[in-house]
Amino acid sequence: LSEERRVKSEEFNSSSDDVSNKNEREESEEGEGQENSSLFTHHSSLYKEQFVGESFGRINKAEAELTLLTLAEYFTKIGKQRVLSESIDVGIISPYRAQVQYLKKLIKKYEFFKPYRRLISVNTVDGFQGQERDVILISLVRSNDEGQIGFLKDLRRMNVAMTRARMKLIILGNKDTMTKHPFYKKLWEYVEGLNNEE
């Protein structure tokens, strides 16, 4: 993955090398039945968080773009017809309201998501309590050299977020920041172990 990679068009052209997106993960190419149900997609520290105020917390715009590119790849992989005919619903969760608002803005912006918008919900961790979706993407936002993760240390809340997916869980974050905390280090190692078993 080029660390400077950005979404190159509003159409999310998913048919080129632009979406090979290794992100330090390997996915099975042998069929959807063999694909792991959990992924931890790592990005570099160039994807920096920004503090935007007490009410809205933090935002990581590059990670938000990566989150939607990852979802576009997944939809493309399993096929538009299947997504729509089976009404495969998606929840995008972030602990920060600023990130939630930015993700909603991007979903409205990109034409790729127009057929799927009714199937996509974006909310905070607390906003998703008691709900499930077929696919869950979690944008962790925090990306700093100090390993500061704020209330992502509230493991009860994060555990709730991570158990909302029926089919597929995709966690997006800066591994170097997050794995300074023992819980996220174990989570990374667990998901890597799943990938290595393929």
Language-model features: where?
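Conserved motor-coupling elements within RecA-like helicase/translocase cores
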Residues: R117-L119, V125-I136
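Short, basic, low-complexity termini and linkers enriched in Ser/Thr/Gly/Pro
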Residues: S2-E11, S16-N21, E26-L46
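Flexible, glycine/threonine-enriched loop-and-boundary segments that flank and lead into catalytic domains
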Residues: V83, L106-T124
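Conserved helicase/translocase motor-coupling segment
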Residues: L1-S2, Y47-Q101
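Conserved nucleotide-binding/hydrolysis micro-motifs of P-loop NTPases
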Residues: R97-Q99, G127-Q129, R142-D145, M167, ...
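A short beta-strand element within the Helicase C-terminal
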Residues: Q131-R142, I170
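Amphipathic alpha-helical transducer elements in NTP-driven molecular machines
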Residues: A64-L68, V100, V122, V135, ...
